Design a protein with these regions (language model features):
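P-loop NTPase motor core of the ASCE superfamily
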Residues: 36-83, 227-346
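Short amphipathic alpha-helical segments
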Residues: 9-10, 192-193, 226-228, 256-257
């Protein structure tokens, strides 16, 4: 979040999408409702209750609504059709003598109303042309604009999880696929068990499909602590490769007190002495692969440093040069000379 990947995306010829302009339709890419009904049901379930308060009866009724909506309109189905099915079921003779069932139907109607066409977030989830296209080779999604609307952010992020997982499994295994989630604690903070289940499944099985997930956070505690969500622990536990970079000294000391067996004394000491990359021109990190550990330094050339930079002044410099008519390549080139002239000249 924060446009940190905008320059990289443009340099690589990727597609850059802002969260404010993202558009979804849960029914958009379905070809077989028998294979996809539960996936759509899970998406609507998380949207309706991000904290996972729907029970098996709620979900059974919601699955009926999803199937009925698809059978009536196929890819033209919308969340409105799901809500209309629930309303008709609530008013039907079938449940006239079942106040508990009718109560659950009414609860879902209220919870999903905000995502209908005329609801608060309807514009995001009822599009005839969803933003994510299957022909794009690189897509960067910037969700910073949704931070002040946590319910919408949860709905969008889980919709993305489902879309990405679907792309992982339904594209040729000869095609390499990579999903990178930066500031991943926002994703991993979900309390809904479904999110953890999806992440656990994805991290365990994507390698069979020549895919990989990379999840980045500022603090190891986001992944591995008593406060970490089930989604965070699933990501950590199912990752064969772990890269530990510079940590906050205070937070890392606290973590080692709580989990004294996670790192050996030498490892704790070395990690604690990692310097800031901007001061030493390289990043130090500990690489853990299964039971093996090794130490590394990452050096990046000045042009790449300029392209990857998310510092405020660097970002503004590139944007100003773009306004002056320079291409993204020319703007990054000038930034590299501005920041590292002698190194560029050598």
């Amino acid at each position: 979040m924060g446009d940190g990947y905008k320059s990289l995306c443009e340099n690589m010829g990727g597609v850059y999408l802002d969260g404010e302009t993202l558009r979804f339709n849960p029914f958009a890419n379905i070809t077989d409702i028998d294979q996809s009904a539960e996936r759509v049901r899970d998406q609507l379930s998380v949207m309706a209750s991000p904290n996972g308060n729907l029970d098996e009866v709620h979900e059974g009724l919601l699955l009926q609504a999803v199937r009925a909506s698809w059978l009536a309109k196929e890819n033209r189905a919308r969340i409105d059709d799901v809500v209309d099915f629930l309303k008709n079921a609530s008013d039907s003779e079938q449940y006239a003598g079942s106040p508990t069932i009718r109560s659950r139907l009414d609860e879902m109607i209220v919870l999903l109303d905000q995502y209908t066409a005329n609801g608060t977030y309807g514009q995001y989830f009822n599009s005839d042309e969803p933003s994510l296209r299957d022909d794009a080779k690189m897509v960067v999604l910037e969700l910073g604009g949704l931070e002040d609307r946590p319910s919408l952010l949860v709905a969008v992020m889980f919709s993305l999880i489902i879309y990405i997982e679907n792309r992982m499994y339904r594209t040729p295994r000869t095609l390499k696929k990579l999903n990178v989630i930066d500031e991943g604690w926002r994703l991993l903070d979900f309390k809904n068990r479904k999110v953890g289940e999806f992440i656990q499944k994805g991290y365990r099985t994507c390698r069979r499909h020549t895919g990989a997930y990379i999840t980045i956070t500022q603090n190891i505690v986001d992944f591995d602590s008593d406060k970490a969500s089930s989604a965070a622990r699933a990501a950590w536990g199912n990752s064969s490769y772990k890269i530990i970079l510079k940590q906050s000294a205070k937070e890392f000391a606290k973590y080692n007190q709580l989990f004294p067996d996670q790192f050996q004394p030498l490892q704790r000491d070395m990690i604690g002495k990692f310097g800031a990359a901007k001061d030493q021109w390289f990043s130090s990190f500990l690489l853990q692969v299964e039971n093996h550990s090794s130490w590394h330094r990452l050096f990046v050339d000045p042009l790449s440093r300029a392209m990857y930079s998310s510092d405020g002044p660097d970002f503004e410099f590139v944007q100003q040069k773009r306004k002056e008519g320079l291409s993204i390549h020319e703007a990054v080139w000038q930034l590299a000379w501005k920041k590292s002239g002698p190194e560029m000249a050598s």
